[in-house]
Amino acid sequence: MNILVIVAHPDDEVLGMGGTIKKYTKNKHDVKIVIMATGIFARRSQNYQNSTSYKFDKKTIKNMEMELVDLKKDCKKAAKIMGVTDVEFMDFPDNEMDTISNLEVTKKIELVIEHYKPSIVFTHSKYDVNVDHRVLYDATITATRPTSNLSIKKVISFEVPSSTEWYFPSQFSPNIFVDINKELETKIKALMAYKNEIRDFPHPRSVDAIRVIAKRWGTVSGLHAAEAFSLVRDINNSVP
């Protein structure tokens, strides 16, 4: 089975569903991760297209380009830890995806779906403080609209700690819980591959917080550790 994970930034895939990804690959499913935005915070002029439009001198631009290269290396390392070898980067501007037309973002996702033919698509929750996450949810829902020739049977959204929980007043309401007790340490190891993204507790992107979140969802679902998801669409040929 082909599983497509569409995220805005490098590390979102680990924070949201690193344990579940590992569970899929352990069970011999194929997982593809698509990173839509750069993950390098945008201090750029409007209508950003590439590094030349940064409002910085050449040295600073070069440093940011090197940082982006390092971030992509970290992403591939994290993916490998989770058992994933297929990672694609789209390089949309970070925290500015609302400046890109929904059609352009949707078409990028549609092309990936056309070639990869996933059975399940995961993406961000609609209820998220990060604008890139919200844009991606909308684009993914459009790209996965059910048609007779579409391979997708399920569309599922996930939370990203340090982003989803800060959205108000509507909130992420999970109805799927995946047991990651055996995969939690792998998730932590994959997160630590992002050497510049880890924070100290009590930040939600700290190692301790990731453990707490997994344990918390476990208490909700009768498990020792879990990742939480919200089912967006489930097309089934058999009765529930």
Residues of each region from the PLM?
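The feature marks non-catalytic terminal segments
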Residues: 1-2, 54-56, 74, 78-82, ...
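Active-site rim/loop-helix segments in enzyme catalytic domains that contact anionic ligands
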Residues: 1-116, 146, 230
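Alpha-helical elements of Rossmann-like donor-binding domains used by nucleotide-donor carbohydrate transfer enzymes
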Residues: 19-23, 74-77, 104, 108, ...
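Residue-level detector of flexible, active-site-proximal loop/helix-junction positions
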Residues: 38-40, 94-96, 128, 162-164, ...
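Short, well-ordered secondary-structure micro-motifs
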Residues: 44-46, 99-101, 133-134, 166-169, ...
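Short, well-ordered beta-to-alpha junction loops that form the rim of enzyme active sites
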Residues: 91-93, 123-126, 159-160
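Active-site adenylate/phosphate-handling loop in enzymes that bind or generate adenylated species
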Residues: 106-154
